[in-house]
């Protein structure tokens, strides 16, 4: 993989990570404002404070958490020099796929296989199913005008 592509992917990873963390901060600020508006003085408020990481994990969705982990893993792979190599077949992941999903671990073929094995595969039905010629309308389907 050339240095230019590697730097481009690294930048995309860092930008996506920043976006997710920004969404977290926005959520946190909103929760703080709402909490301050309805706050009653309590002695136990300071007890049991969470660490920043625990708060982060509590306030992010599961998808955002998984994406953050994948981004961090991809950044580690860049540092180790193993970024852009499919973890299943060992082939280089094509540039268009890396640009679209810079935290991907697999080439498209292997990703589909992994999804099938894990039960998360959703087939693409293609454009043809939306072709107006393929749509049949029965007379009873049409409401009276």
UniProtKB/Swiss-Prot annotation:
dksA C4-type ZnF: 86-110
SUPFAM superfamilies cross-referenced by the UniProt entry: DnaK suppressor protein DksA, alpha-hairpin domain, Glucocorticoid receptor-like (DNA-binding domain)
Annotated GO MF terms: zinc ion binding
InterPro entries: DnaK_N, Znf_DskA_TraR, Znf_DskA_TraR_CS
Gene3D superfamilies in the record: DksA, coiled-coil domain
Keywords of this entry: Metal-binding, Zinc, Zinc-finger
Designated name of the protein: Uncharacterized protein aq_250
Lineage of the organism: Bacteria, Pseudomonadati, Aquificota, Aquificia, Aquificales
